[in-house]
């Protein structure tokens, strides 16, 4: 018996093809409209912060940017003991993304349309990825939604870290009792001790300072406390995600590492803490003795050179700069501009470190690779090209050896809390507004 196959579409079925094309066109129009409106809301919110709400940003004097990650690691990690390495969950429900926008977008029609679009296309978005996770980089509107979702998480998490006694939910009752315990001790001790002495004694019973910084999915909590203190925060984080975002947070996504025994990676920085013993010969009243001093030193490795070699092929296996065949067809100024762009991005990324040997090596490799690429394009040797194109080589040198003050300005502040500098906790954030990708 003959049965029609609905999956075979003949070329004469113009009506079906027309509807299919229209459906795809309507989908793209709706997607562009939703993205434009969401960007407009983000833009209005940014303008309101820049014009009328500057005080809210100025009050947070302990904010830090991406350029201060290196000084933070070099200056503070020698005094810290444990870190909590955490990954933000990728499996996000579509309704949670809409709910994060509901607090600052009052247009109900837009929210309903966005919810309708996400519910109809969420399965196709998830199924595009082999592991079933939510990757916002593949769609602009999903990137905006994911950023708002992370922003909402951080605003609640930082509030929980600073003023956790405001929460009345069951998982944080123990934290509430601990803070009330500190208040009771303060009332008992104040009549007998001076305020300064009490602040010094309060440091012994209060939890030590807790540093927080994040990049993309990964965020790190660093502390001077014991492993028991970090285990408490591990439980707090798991309960936090499950309670406020209805997400099943796996404990294997959180790692407690001791800095003296382990290393960690963030922002492609490979950091570890080493102890260097030193022996000093001292003499008091004609009696010499040897004192053994241990100095903690933070070692930061930036494996950026190998990644550039694998992707762009700027140098060979022996480490010698080579010409790039993929850029020979471009103009001279385009080749120079692209390599300058690569170096500028790397400089903005790595210039916070006091050890810039790898950065200077990258500058040398990119400069010689650019000269050899230009010489190969003009079918001459490097020496002949440099002699014939003196003006072009001078412009190339000016681009690579621009003064550091023209590119970057760093400002460091010492932040002290209400305890007069005894208890210091800092929140590190990344303020990248635009990214120029590597050529």
Curated annotation (Swiss-Prot):
Keywords: mRNA processing, Plastid, RNA-binding, tRNA processing
Residues spanning the signal sequence: none
Tagged with keyword Repressor: no
Alphabetized GO MF terms: RNA binding
GO process annotations (BP): mRNA processing; RNA splicing; tRNA processing
HAMAP family in the cross-refs: MatK
General function of this protein: Usually encoded in the trnK tRNA gene intron. Its retention as a freestanding gene in this organism suggests it acts in trans to assist in splicing chloroplast group II introns.
Family: Belongs to the intron maturase 2 family. MatK subfamily.
Protein name: Maturase K
